[in-house]
Amino acid sequence: MATSISRRQFLKASGLAAASACAAGLLSSCGGSSSAGSTGGSASGSVDTTKYTILYSSQPATLNYLTTATDLEMVVGANCVDTLVEYDNKGVMREGLATSWDWDADTLTWTFHLREENWVDNNGEVVAPVTAQDFVDALKYVLTPDYASSNVGLVTAYVAGAEDYYNYYVYLNNANTGVVDDDGTTYTADASGVVTVTSSDGTAETYSPVDFDTVGIKAVDDHTLTYTLTYDFPGFLSLLCYLPYEPAYGPLL
């Protein structure tokens, strides 16, 4: 089947909030990006360059681009929400929502400077500006075990503090729900939130509560975003083209 979706329309996403009834906003096309055109023309031969037409074999099960790892669903998010950087049709990296970026090898930190863009509703009306905090909110969503993001490993392996934050809440959820692993590992939590993980041989480790402020992503101001890495990973810029690093409109999460 074929469907036409506007680059500036709002995706009604059933899974983006815990109630599975929240909506994901679309970003307007970046100034440095090529606009996507319709694959079809009118009788006069003109092409509607405000529409992007895509063919797909079945309906997406979700439009939650922060959690899905299904090709069909990832295509929707990739075509509708801008990333910090992107590749052109020759495979050359160029500006996306970021106008420039810098690497500090001493602190293992990338700094991105954002252009002014907006979230829009299903009528193309501006809802709010896109800010660095939208990237922070989206990454926190990805790292929250309750939302079961299939792409969380693309974050925990590279962003400083992300693995500790994610693992703590996995362990806490296990303790709260009485999970016992196949190997006999058990989880308990005290009133202060300290989790004890006890293996079948009696060996125990404790994990104190972890605040999201310890994760290596910061909104310095509305248009400045930083990522601090666990190590100097040369492919991090490419990684930013993947869905878990896309922004999301915070009030809708």
Explain the meaning of each model-derived region.
Residues L55-A105:
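N-terminal lobe/hinge region of extracytoplasmic solute-binding protein
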Residues A2-A21:
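N-terminal secretory signal peptides and thylakoid transit peptides that target proteins
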Residues D48-S58, T109-F112, L225-T226:
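Short, well-ordered beta-strand elements
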Residues D134, Y141-L253:
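Surface-exposed binding/hinge segments that line
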Residues S57-P60, N89-K90, D106, R115-E117, ...:
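Solvent-exposed coil/turn segments that connect beta secondary-structure elements
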Residues L26, C30-G41:
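Bacterial lipoprotein signal-peptidase II cleavage site
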Residues V75-N79, V92, G96, V130, ...:
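Extracytoplasmic/secreted proteins, especially bacterial periplasmic and envelope-associated proteins
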